[in-house]
Swiss-Prot record:
Keywords carried by this UniProt record: Cell membrane, Membrane, Methanogenesis, Methyltransferase, One-carbon metabolism, Transferase, Translocase, Transmembrane, Transmembrane helix
Protein name: Tetrahydromethanopterin S-methyltransferase subunit D
Organism: Methanothermobacter thermautotrophicus (strain ATCC 29096 / DSM 1053 / JCM 10044 / NBRC 100330 / Delta H) (Methanobacterium thermoautotrophicum)
Biochemical pathway: One-carbon metabolism; methanogenesis from CO(2); methyl-coenzyme M from 5,10-methylene-5,6,7,8-tetrahydromethanopterin: step 2/2
Metal-binding as UniProt keyword: no
Organism lineage: Archaea, Methanobacteriati, Methanobacteriota, Methanomada group, Methanobacteria
Residues spanning the membrane: 4-24, 39-59, 67-87, 133-153, 166-186, 209-229
Intracellular or extracellular location(s): Cell membrane
Highest taxon listed in the record's lineage: Archaea
Amino acid sequence: MDPLLLIGAITAGGVLIGGGVHFVPVGGAPAAMATATGVGTGTAMLAAGAGLTGLITAAAMTGQSPLMIMAAGAVGSMLMIGITMLVGNLIYVYGVGTVPVSAKVAVDPLTGMEQEKYVTPGTEGHGLPTVCFVSGIIGGALGGIGGGLIYWALNEALKTLSYGAIGAAGVAAIFAVGIFFINAVIASYNIGGTIEGFHDPKFKRIGRGIVACLIASIVAGALSTLLVYGGVF
């Protein structure tokens, strides 16, 4: 693979990952206590979890076309984040006894359902209303596509060296995981805590986050290229 193509693929994948993280609804510790909307965990942890699942499904398509690998990555990430949000909602509704609503919008932007009168006083919402669920699925898809693209590019580059198919796939997966974490953490710092999805005011920070991930991914791509073609492997 051409070194510039490898850097470009890693950069594009990193930007997709960083952008996708901004769509994922994360409420942190307050959400774990049903006092904020979103999944009760950290941004980087949830995004990385979905990304790792996407990388597993992408790796399962090794040897297929790049589009198939990226599609598999998207499906894996979407399933992981979707199941996580679904189970979370089941716990919020039937365990805690709260209605999935957001305190940051008067009505759900997608369904038009009123939110304010269902928000428990003293909280910022709870559960995952429709807009958060859809936003999370979009974020998972973007992250999965980005991770799949990075994996494919690294695997193609490593296959031309002394590695066998299994060795190339393993090293490519390790590299992809590292690059995924880099961009997930950068996006998490840009968000600065919790976010509900594309309807959250913090979502406006996505432009700055994409620029940061672009720069970091170019550096990561250049270092990866030096390692791959510089005689390390």
